[in-house]
């Protein structure tokens, strides 16, 4: 396994770990932290996907923009997944930096469920890029 492949695997592992963390945080009613971990699960998985395509970015906004440009706008990723990643990007910022922000438990549960589907869908794209 070369260095790039090791980094891709690392990001994929981190994505799953963050989603597992989000579930634990939800059980402990730590909704802000759960939202943060959901976002990072998506971010790490998208970072792995972009690196598999030979792209790397230092800023979260760069990762988001490249994902939308390279995968959502081209139809390689369902637009709903793109919208979900965009929403979680905003929720994470609001939750981390906003004042008097509260998240509803049912919303966080739904976001975890959607994040599982997101990670699975991106996983398939990463595997396709590895085979290409």
Curated annotation (Swiss-Prot):
Classification via Gene3D superfamilies: Nucleotidyltransferases domain 2 (1.20.120.330)
Lineage: Bacteria, Thermotogati, Thermotogota, Thermotogae, Thermotogales
Transmembrane segments: none
Protein family membership: Belongs to the UPF0332 family.
Organism from which the protein derives: Thermotoga maritima (strain ATCC 43589 / DSM 3109 / JCM 10099 / NBRC 100826 / MSB8)
Stated name of the protein: UPF0332 protein TM_1000
């Amino acid at each position: 396994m070369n260095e790039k492949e090791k980094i891709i695997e690392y990001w994929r592992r981190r994505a799953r770990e963050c989603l597992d963390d989000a579930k634990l945080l939800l059980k402990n009613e730590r909704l802000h932290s759960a939202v943060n971990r959901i976002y990072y699960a998506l971010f790490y998985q998208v970072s792995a996907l972009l690196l598999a395509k030979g792209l790397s970015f230092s800023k979260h906004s760069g990762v988001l923009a490249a994902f939308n440009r390279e995968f959502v706008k081209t139809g390689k990723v369902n637009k709903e997944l793109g919208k979900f990643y965009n929403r979680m990007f905003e929720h994470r910022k609001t939750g981390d930096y906003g004042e008097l922000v509260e998240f509803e438990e049912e919303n966080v549960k739904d976001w975890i469920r959607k994040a599982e589907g997101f990670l699975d869908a991106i996983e398939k794209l990463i595997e396709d890029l590895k085979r290409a």
